[in-house]
């Protein structure tokens, strides 16, 4: 006997209970309506740091995965899914394996400018035979990567410029984010106005580059000057970056060359000096040429540095005047920083000319008029000395003539006075008791016919005269001799008179027998 089945009247209530039970189970499982929430609209992070992108759900149904994307549309990039795969630098914040976990936030480490963009948290429904279907997406979180700009690099012209030349300098920096940035130029503390400044790209990008150009007018005092490019950005905390260009690497100051003569060390030697002043850089070569032929080659090593950064160099060249019979042209040739040579010439008179003039003279081909001023001054001084010497000699001559006129003893100018002179001499001889008495007489002899000129003879003469005196009371005759010693003849200078008179002095020694 078969068991009896449920009565048909009881089947309806049973099905109703099953449907109610299923409805209650579904309501408890889903809880709330599905909603994907990304609380932050944007976050900023410095390059190299970490950031967290938050995402929460209100329900896990329908069943399906949750994924993170950067960007929207077909070109969006999958960043992370919670399927257990390994993704460098990205991790989930919560443990998604726990029952009823609703937190699907992620952490990005070591952020780079390439990580900038808008990130979306997306809920999918798993399909049985078809691909998963996107159900809902969060509002998106934009990540701003604060990337510091690279240190500015300043570049200048390839070749050195000269004073008063205009040269351009360029400053570049890259890899910064966000796009806003400030760039300024300075020279020796004074701000310069740039010719052009550009930031690329013009639209949105993960990082940006900046380039700026400025024009500088060089001058000879710029050897120690600097051109500075200053970059300010939000990531630098009010400490701008600077790029520096030393103008000493971009300027050339040519030397001023002078050739001068120093005081001679002897009558046959002259020092020539070649000075190269205020030049930069220190690359210098100096060559001495003699009549166009190389005489000496200098490679300076010990240069004198000026306070403005330029250099000086002095080269000495000793000239032996006795070795040159003709005029010689000496050339100082200066080659600086592989530029055309600068030459200065200096002409030196030969030994034949200099011996006639008493000293060696030089004539610089460059403007050396100060040497002539020295010569003129010396000449005037010498002329004054000559005039003074002539005046002194003239006064001395007059005094000598007056002295001769005052010391002259008795002068006899007429021939008939000779007899009286003889009588006076005889009287003097008779009155003399000492045989060695010396008598001085001024004999002005009568003028006779002018003798022919003859060669000068010594002034000291010794003459002997025999003088016979008159009879004396004694029986024997007395013979007296006179020794005329040290006769000095003094002739006067020619005068307007026809013939000048002259006087003779004699020393008479009388010997009595």
From Swiss-Prot:
Membrane topology: Single-pass type I membrane protein
UniProt organism field: Mus musculus (Mouse)
Domain Ig-like C1-type as annotated: residue spans: 149-248, 255-343
Record note on modification: N-glycosylated. Phosphorylated on tyrosine residues.
Ranges facing Extracellular side: 32-373
PROSITE patterns tied to this protein: IG_LIKE, IG_MHC
Biased composition, class Polar residues, residue ranges: 504-513
Protein's recorded name: Tyrosine-protein phosphatase non-receptor type substrate 1
UniProt-annotated glycosylation sites, renumbered to this chain: 54, 92, 168, 180, 205, 209, 246, 271, 293, 302, 312, 320, 345, 367
Cytoplasmic topological domain: 395-511
Gene (name only): Sirpa
Subunit structure: Binds PTPN11 when tyrosine-phosphorylated, except in macrophages, where it primarily binds PTPN6. Binds GRB2 vitro. Binds FGR. Binds JAK2 irrespective of its phosphorylation status and forms a stable complex. Binds SCAP1 and/or SCAP2. The resulting complex recruits FYB1. Binds PTK2B. Interacts with TRIM2.
Functional note: Immunoglobulin-like cell surface receptor for CD47. Acts as a docking protein and induces translocation of PTPN6, PTPN11 and other binding partners from the cytosol to the plasma membrane. Supports adhesion of cerebellar neurons, neurite outgrowth and glial cell attachment. May play a key role in intracellular signaling during synaptogenesis and in synaptic function. Involved in the negative regulation of receptor tyrosine kinase-coupled cellular responses induced by cell adhesion, growth factors or insulin.
Covalent S-S links between cysteines: 55-121, 171-229, 274-332
